[in-house]
Amino acid sequence: MVDMYASLRSNVGTLGQILGDTIRTDLDDTFLDKIEQIRHLAKSSRQGDSAARKEMLTLLSSLSDDELVPFAKAFNQFLNLANIAEQFHTISRNCDELVCVPDPVEQLLGRMLGGNIDQEKVLACLKTLDIDLVLTAHPTEISRRTLIQKYSAVIDSLTAQENTQLTEQEKKQHHLRLRQLIAQIWHTNEIRNERPTPVDEARWGLCTIEASLWQAVPDFLRQLNQQVEERTNTQLPTDIAPVRFSSWMGGDRDGNPFVTSAVTQEVLDRNRHTAARLYLKDVVLLVNELSMEGANEALLAYTNNSNEPYRDVLRTLRQKLRNTIDYLNGRLEGQHPDVDPSEIIWHESDLKDPLMMLYQSLCDRGMSLIANGLLLDMLRRIACFGIHMLRLDVRQDADRHADVIAELTRYLGMGDYAHWDETEKQSFLLRELSSKRPLIPANWQASPEVEEVVKTCRLVATQPARAMGSYVISMASQPSDVLAVLLLLKETGCPHPMRVVPLFETLDDLNNASACMSALFSIDWYRGYTKGIQEVMIGYSDSAKDAGVMAAAWAQYTAQEKLVAISQEANIKLTLFHGRGGTIGRGGGPAHEAILSQPPGSVDGRIRVTEQGEMIRFKFGLPKLAVQSLALYTSAVMEATLLPPPEPKPEWRQCMQQLAEESVLAYRAIVREEPDFVSYFRAATPEIELGKLPLGSRPAKRRVDGGIESLRAIPWIFAWSQNRLMLPAWLGAGEALKAASERGDLPLLQEMEKHWPFFKTRISMLEMVYAKAEPNLSKFYETSLVPKELHHLGVQLRERLAIGIEAVLELTQAESLMAHTPWNRESVELRNPYIDPLNFLQAELLARTRREEQSSKNVELALMLTIAGVAAGMRNTG
């Protein structure tokens, strides 16, 4: 039998061997031998060899302080290199067909156009697709930007070595380059010395666009155009942009005091600066390309019958882009440069219109072949990225807006808004929204917290509409939460209607979302403001932390169904914004399956989805990977729109409702009602130590005091993934499935898993999490770190994990987890022998740091490296 993953294992082996040689050169044979010995013992330990495990633990505990950092670094870097090999494998020529699916758009177009869907309907859907991927910094990408660039260079080197035409000398050169890169990686500090600022995070997002998406977007659209043309003999429009990009980096101030109005302004300027700089590169290339003379009458008239009409137009654009960069450099340096708007790129049309004139002229003069090269690529970049690169969302907590209005009403002697009921609040807000006089007095001295919210609204008011995305209200629950933001935007002079988006996060808020929106839709003023268009955000992270994944998933599903129904009834065009994380506990998982498992009618050609931290790198970090991801999103949204899944049967709904009710009880019985749970959580995981790691710009807690409810969803999940129990991603679900099976519902569950995409996705996600969970490792953390009087809770949790695994295997009728997804299983198994030693060492280091009043620098750094390494191995942080 052919080994499906031979080339993957070969690359992992090659990279691992080079890393080993690098370590030997830097340290010595003895140290490398010790690493290899521990790795082999970890493999044997995983196969049940208790003597090997004992020997490995003895070796780990005997590591000197000086050995801790290089040891943790070695295993950490091996896991990063394994990730690189896996990323490369999915875009490699040697990639196995089971891993690299054929182009999803090509498959879908074939299925639709070969079936009974009208060609015009398919093309109309494709041309109007509105997929907005929102880049966010949390859960923070653990790897430093400098290392990410080196990892990309490793993939470039592996790609170059695939060329079968290379001479021996060229092969040696590429291998030498690989060795140099891995040596650079080994000698680079992996852990940031300082926590990144929100501006650093925004720059990281811009780097992803420059390094990958800038090339991937036109590449993808060229492939898409070719597929459509071959099947329909139709060209796609020059300005087609099925996928666009927005960002929360520098705009998300929910619980992050470091995101101020000044920071948001700087990020907006940086976004625009990056766009101008990249467009300038394109124009410089076009000046060289478009040397031809023949032009249509419009272009000749515009250039006064120039001998080089195309170059004349491009030279003017080149100068305007240079002026734009100079202007933005001045702003970023804190100056307020005077500028003639006609001398810079001020509006998108300043850039697009001259280029469209060149495009039309080339086509008119029989030079379409030339027009459809770099010039079309640039036009499509403009359609996707605009002149602001990323549309920036603003996100703020609902309470912060209420605080502004309460402080204002008290100052004006109108009473205390904070003490009014919902009816009184709505009445006041609507009266003020309709009033022609200003509400905020010119001489009002607000408190610093309130002033910052007002400053943000003032900033939004000064920005071009296309620079901004949505104003997202976190923890929204009432119509007044939305109306309050609209009033603040009105009072600060916002000249254009901005999308104001409630984010429903908790179980109760999801269940009440349709009632809240229905109340808003019944307000004439509000309907006039929205002009029949509404966006609503569904929160995955906090609802799962509140109720467990099974109950949260059902609440998200039913909330969407109801929102779609009331929007259709009110003749409102609804866009659902999915706040998914990279992990299962935060709504993560394969995007294609996730979109196809949404309720019928909820996608309808448009969707917004957050793309989180480390998942941005895994999906979009390389141009070829990004093209695959763009194709997956496009095909999934088209399929969900034109071939939506069937409505779930009433008996499926009833069963799912019961599963949700039972799972939330099982989840909360532990997380909320077990008195020792918080103490166990803090002892058994590195939750406290995670707060010290210089990861994202945002504090780990919403409040300094408080328990699990005050902890952000990201560190909550990150901590449990470190000790390998993965608890937030499964607790409650297995117990509910077992109860359903015991009451005779197993055939019904199997029918649901086979025919209902929503339920199938849930079970698939559970399988993946169960496969990654390691009860023996979590028990080791418990033995090393948790007071004995709390061990009973660990026993209970591991029993629940076993119940869940058994329930899922019974449902799927499989002998092992992920039997139907061998690639995912291979991915997990490949990493385990390298993650396990890091886990054992982490538990040892946690015990040391908690025993000692002052740990050595080496112990602290090694602990951080184990945290980074486990995150790299688990392929997710929070």
Swiss-Prot record:
GO molecular function: magnesium ion binding; phosphoenolpyruvate carboxylase activity
Gene Ontology CC entries for this record: cytosol
Active-site feature positions: H138, K545
PROSITE patterns: PEPCASE_1 (PS00781), PEPCASE_2 (PS00393)
Catalytic reactions of this protein: oxaloacetate + phosphate = phosphoenolpyruvate + hydrogencarbonate
SUPFAM superfamilies per the UniProt record, alphabetical: Phosphoenolpyruvate/pyruvate domain
Pfam families: PEPcase (PF00311)
Lyase as UniProt keyword: yes
Named cofactor requirement(s): Mg(2+)
EC nos: 4.1.1.31
Assigned keywords, A-Z: Carbon dioxide fixation, Lyase, Magnesium
EC top class, as a word: lyase
GO process annotations (BP): carbon fixation; oxaloacetate metabolic process; tricarboxylic acid cycle
UniProt record similarity statement: Belongs to the PEPCase type 1 family.
Function: Forms oxaloacetate, a four-carbon dicarboxylic acid source for the tricarboxylic acid cycle.
Protein name: Phosphoenolpyruvate carboxylase
Organism of derivation: Shewanella halifaxensis (strain HAW-EB4)
